[in-house]
Amino acid sequence: MPNEFELAVAALQRDGVIAYATEAVFGLGCDPDSESAVHRLLAIKQRPVEKGLILIAADLAQLQDYIDLDQLTSEQLARVEASWPGPFTWIMPARSNTPAWLTGQFTTLAVRVTAHPQVQALCRAFGKPLVSTSANLTGEEPARRVADIGELLASQLAYILPGEVGGQANPSEIKDARTGAIIRPS
């Protein structure tokens, strides 16, 4: 019988959208390389593609196919790396081949290396980062427990990975890697 990670990875490989615990809230995730999965996630969230999305990864290496580290100075990269793994999301220059279904209207991409052990294990088992957005409809309170994921939302998910959110009170802070400007405070 498959374990919970195997079921979650199988759902991701079938272009499904899953829910999983992150540092502060439950997230919705999917395969960032699957346009159909990303559009399914956006439809569930009722979120416009133009806003762009966040990728969450087990380590920086998992993000290198999506972000252009050559556009950062060594000081900028050091600042980013010093905050990871952790609840810090950075806006980084996207590679020219990073799809618009991830970047939205931008030439940048929001990325995070998670400190949440279950998410790290999930990204490692899947072999790449996940699209990550809060498990709620746009404008509603995010889910902090499996029980908080509404029936409407749950019915549209391929799998809900049981787990506990980390100790963060708020979703991750978002900063611009080049300027250090805070886009969303924690």
Swiss-Prot record:
Keyword line: ATP-binding, Cytoplasm, Nucleotide-binding, Nucleotidyltransferase, Transferase, tRNA processing
PROSITE patterns listed in its UniProt record: YRDC (PS51163)
Coiled coil: none
One GO-annotated biological process of the protein: regulation of translational fidelity
Cited Gene3D superfamilies: DHBP synthase
GO-annotated molecular function: ATP binding; double-stranded RNA binding; L-threonylcarbamoyladenylate synthase; tRNA binding
HAMAP family: TsaC
Family: Belongs to the SUA5 family. TsaC subfamily.
Protein function: Required for the formation of a threonylcarbamoyl group on adenosine at position 37 (t(6)A37) in tRNAs that read codons beginning with adenine. Catalyzes the conversion of L-threonine, HCO(3)(-)/CO(2) and ATP to give threonylcarbamoyl-AMP (TC-AMP) as the acyladenylate intermediate, with the release of diphosphate.
UniProt protein name: Threonylcarbamoyl-AMP synthase
Gene: tsaC
